[in-house]
Amino acid sequence: MELGGKCNAITTTTMISTEVKPHTDPEPEAKPESDPSMALFPIKKENQKPKTRVDQGAKYRECQKNHAASTGGHVVDGCCEFMAGGEEGTLGALKCAACNCHRSFHRKEVYGHRNSKQDHQLMITPAFYSSNSSYKPRVMHPTGEIGRRTSSSSEDMKKILSHRNQNVDGKSLMMMMMRKKKRVRTKINEEQKEKMKEFAERLGWRMQKKDEEEIDKFCRMVNLRRQVFKVWMHNNKQAMKRNNSNISE
C-alpha cells in the first residue's frame, strides 16, 4: 500500500511539472490611424511663403497695347516701363500708373529664364478688316521694335482715337486726314485778275506800309482777302514784268 501511494504521488508530480504554459507575445502598441485626405491635401507650414511673380525676378517693360487696332493702324502710348498703381496684392497693382493699362499689355522680361524661342517668335498686330479695305496686318518683332517703327505724334493719336467708335476703316481715315491738311484754294475770275494787275502796277508790285489803307479798301472792293492779293502779287510779279518787257521790245 505504501508503494502504491508513492507511485501515485510521483505520477501526479510529473504531470504538473510537464504542463507548459503557452508563450504570449506582448501586445503591439496601437498606432494612430492616418487620414488618407492628409496625403492628398498636405497642410502648409505657416512660415512657408508661396513664391510670387515678383520673387521670380520678372519685370514688365514697354506697353504694347495698340490704341488704333479698330481703325487698322498701330499706335502705342509710349510707356517704357510698367509702374504698379497700388500695393502688391491689390487690384491697383495690376494697372500701370503711367498709362493706366493692364500689366498683361506690357512686355514681360524674366531674368535667367529667357526663352530662346522668343527671339524668333513673330507677333501680328490686330487689324480692322472691311470689305472696302485692302489693309494687311504688319508683322513685328516683340523685342522693343514698336517704339522705333511707330513714330506717331500725339496729334495723330488723338485723331485716330476720336474715330475709334465710328465705323470707318483705315483707308477712309487717311483720306479724311489728307482732306484736312489740303489747303483751300480761292478761285479768282478774270475781272478780279485785271483789277489786281492794274492796282499792283500802280503800287510798283510792292506792298508798303504807307499803302495799307488803300490796299484794304481795294480788297473790299474786289471781294478778296488781303492775304490772297499778297500771294497773287508775289506769284505773278516776275511773270507780269517779263510780259511787259517783251511787249516793249
UniProtKB/Swiss-Prot annotation:
The protein's organism comes out as Arabidopsis thaliana
Q: Show the domain comment.
A: The homeodomain differs form the typical one by having namely 4 instead of 3 extra amino acids inserted in the loop between helix 1 and helix 2.
NCBIfam families recorded = homeo_ZF_HD (TIGR01565), ZF_HD_prot_N (TIGR01566)
Basic and acidic residues bias: start-end ranges? 20-34, 43-54
Binding partners and assembly: Homo- and heterodimer with other ZFHD proteins. Interacts with MIF1 and MIF3; these interactions prevent nuclear localization and DNA-binding to inhibit transcription regulation activity. Binds to ZHD1, ZHD2, ZHD4, ZHD10 and ZHD11.
Reported tissue expression:
Mostly expressed in flowers and inflorescence.
Site note Required for DNA-binding, residues: M233
Name of the molecule in the record: Zinc-finger homeodomain protein 7
SUPFAM superfamilies found in the cross-reference section: Homeodomain-like
Query: Chief localization class?
Result: nucleus
The gene name on file is: ZHD7
Positions of the DNA-binding region: 181-244
Subcellular localization, per the record? Nucleus
Q: Which InterPro entries match?
A: HD (IPR001356), Homeodomain-like_sf (IPR009057), Homeodomain_ZF_HD (IPR006455), ZF_HD_homeobox_Cys/His_dimer (IPR006456)
Q: Which GO terms describe its molecular function?
A: DNA binding; protein homodimerization activity; zinc ion binding
Q: What does this protein do?
A: Putative transcription factor.
